[in-house]
Amino acid sequence: MPICSLQTFADALPPGRPVLGLDLGTRTIGVATSDVRLTLATPIITIKRRKFTLDVQELFALADGRAAAGLVLGLPVEMDGSEGPRCQATRAFARNLLALRDLPVLLWDERLSTAAVNRFLVGEADMTRARRAEVVDRAAAAYILQGALDALDRQRPEQAF
């Protein structure tokens, strides 16, 4: 399956299974999960990056353990909307991952996600710099995933209660 549009991603997801959100960095990968109703993102772990094959093995183990139906990868678009080297690296990561496993992958604009998470962790959670460094990547993954989940929710038809 190629990298999906939002609609294709939504159509490819089976009901009752979560998705994982990833914040890819050069040294770490922040990972978050959704609930099975695809409404709430929760940070779960930060993976220290090693080699691609080892990183993907760990991601696949997490996905399998949670029965995840797809992946949302943060796409680090520049502020002017252009795609720089980090976007190219994220797209390459997604293509290489898809060469190993066929699953829905959505690239989601992550502009300012880490900055927003840092502001929250400093202002609201009153975390020290050391503690923030431990959680910022997985919290950014949850922020990215929540944005995608909210967009998926807006695409669903209204249901009468």
Swiss-Prot record:
<keyword id="KW-0963">Cytoplasm</keyword>
<dbReference type="GO" id="GO:0004518">
    <property type="term" value="F:nuclease activity"/>
</dbReference>
<comment type="similarity">
    <text>Belongs to the YqgF nuclease family.</text>
</comment>
<dbReference type="GO" id="GO:0000967">
    <property type="term" value="P:rRNA 5'-end processing"/>
</dbReference>
<dbReference type="Pfam" id="PF03652">
    <property type="entry name" value="RuvX"/>
</dbReference>
<dbReference type="InterPro" id="IPR006641">
    <property type="entry name" value="YqgF/RNaseH-like_dom"/>
</dbReference>
<dbReference type="InterPro" id="IPR005227">
    <property type="entry name" value="YqgF"/>
</dbReference>
<keyword id="KW-0540">Nuclease</keyword>
<dbReference type="InterPro" id="IPR012337">
    <property type="entry name" value="RNaseH-like_sf"/>
</dbReference>
<keyword id="KW-0690">Ribosome biogenesis</keyword>
<keyword id="KW-0378">Hydrolase</keyword>
<dbReference type="InterPro" id="IPR037027">
    <property type="entry name" value="YqgF/RNaseH-like_dom_sf"/>
</dbReference>
<comment type="function">
    <text>Could be a nuclease involved in processing of the 5'-end of pre-16S rRNA.</text>
</comment>
<dbReference type="GO" id="GO:0005829">
    <property type="term" value="C:cytosol"/>
</dbReference>
<protein>
    <recommendedName>
        <fullName>Putative pre-16S rRNA nuclease</fullName>
        <ecNumber>3.1.-.-</ecNumber>
    </recommendedName>
</protein>
